[in-house]
Amino acid sequence: MPDNISLNRRIAYIGQVGRGRERFCLEYISTKRAVTQSIEHGLTRDAAAAEKIITCSKGCGECCSTYYIAASLQECEAIVYWLYQHEEALKRFLRTFDTWQAKIADAAKCLNAINLLYGKIILSQATEAEKQAFRSNMNDYESRHITCPFLENGACTIYEVRPYVCACVVSLSPPEWCSLSHPDRKRMEFLKIELPLAKDMPYFIQPKPGILFSAMPMLVYDILSKGYSALADIPGLEILQQLAMNDPEVLAMLREP
């Protein structure tokens, strides 16, 4: 494992700031687990009420190989914490990230546009022109078949802490219709639960944007590889790095061979 990632892992949850991060992650993961279970029950209930069957199943991975996957800062911090507790999932992500990053480099224009508009879309603040621009760039991104680096053999390696955007939608159509090239794709039926993300559990220090969304694999990797430096790049969180790196416990850890 790269030295910078190992170091960031060692100092992530020590000292006053680190303990605040860890408390947040533990509470957030626990809360999100309950919310996700409620989402799953709601989707199952709504499908049954419509006399439909949810056709999503482990091993498919079509959505994970097509769609842009966004997550909030809170979700990405929780994923990082979970990865630190699950060594094989962490190692696999680090092995696959470069391939994913190389693919999104070719999609930089549409990805940047999506990142700029995603928060407005999720919070229903986008204009009609912005909605059209968002959909156009999403179509461009989806046509590239960029597989999520957390997908392995059609299954999510971080399923327990997967983003809400992944948990909130299911297909009611035959699985083969999910393919972009399938002639019946436009006839697909989806079932979706809208989450009030504006009311999601806030980060333990509130960033200036209020709710920060990013391409999930990118922000997760940034936190793993850059640690507090990545968090300090977020408006409103600049002080975190200074507070953490001057903490006596962190300084003592840094002096260790």
Model-based region annotation:
Residues 1-257:
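Short loop/turn segments that flank or connect secondary-structure elements
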